[in-house]
């Protein structure tokens, strides 16, 4: 069975790629990572940074998660991410996504031993 940490990696990590400006990136990746099986996952974020850098967020700024739990952490540096959003009018099984690249601080929930990311909570604008 897939562990929460492995699920996080499958759904959110894409270290090898910089998500070129490829407009079909989300359509390909959402399918490849099994997020269009049985339904179209409405929103998903991929992080284009080394896994070690994302795991290190668990040692960074501790904040409260959207659901009120206290095990969320915000990255101290901005990260290169791609947001995938289901386009309006898109219906399963033809899941179509809008691809947008961003530089954001990301917020992840961590748990376990080793203490690793298990949930992508949010991304926040880099304050200038």
Curated annotation (Swiss-Prot):
InterPro entries per UniProt: RNaseA, RNaseA-like_dom_sf, RNaseA_AS, RNaseA_domain
Q: Summarize tissue expression.
A: Pancreas.
Molecular function GO terms recorded: lyase activity; nucleic acid binding; ribonuclease A activity; RNA nuclease activity
Q: Which spans are transmembrane here?
A: none
- From the UniProt record, list the reaction(s) this protein catalyses: an [RNA] containing cytidine + H2O = an [RNA]-3'-cytidine-3'-phosphate + a 5'-hydroxy-ribonucleotide-3'-[RNA]; an [RNA] containing uridine + H2O = an [RNA]-3'-uridine-3'-phosphate + a 5'-hydroxy-ribonucleotide-3'-[RNA]
Q: Which SUPFAM superfamilies match?
A: RNase A-like
**Xref: Gene3D superfamilies:** Ribonuclease A-like domain
Keywords (alphabetical) are: Disulfide bond, Endonuclease, Glycoprotein, Hydrolase, Lyase, Nuclease, Secreted
Where is there biased composition of kind Basic and acidic residues?
1-13
| Catalytic residues (positions) | 12, 119
Q: Where is this region: Disordered?
A: 1-26
Q: Give the intrachain disulfide bonds.
A: 26-84, 40-95, 58-110, 65-72
Q: Which GO terms of the cellular component aspect does the record hold?
A: extracellular region
Q: Where, per UniProt, does this protein localize?
A: Secreted
Q: Known EC number(s)?
A: 4.6.1.18
Name the positions where substrate binds.
7, 10, 41-45, 66, 85
Q: Which GO terms describe its biological process?
A: defense response to Gram-positive bacterium
Composition bias type Polar residues, residue spans: 14-26
In terms of domain of life, where is this protein from? Eukaryota
The record's listing under Pfam families reads:
RnaseA (PF00074)
Record: glycosylation sites:
34, 62
Q: Quote the function comment for this protein.
A: Endonuclease that catalyzes the cleavage of RNA on the 3' side of pyrimidine nucleotides. Acts on single-stranded and double-stranded RNA.
Subunit details for this protein?
Monomer. Interacts with and forms tight 1:1 complexes with RNH1. Dimerization of two such complexes may occur. Interaction with RNH1 inhibits this protein.
The entry assigns this protein to a family as follows:
Belongs to the pancreatic ribonuclease family.
What is the protein name stated in its UniProt record?
Ribonuclease pancreatic
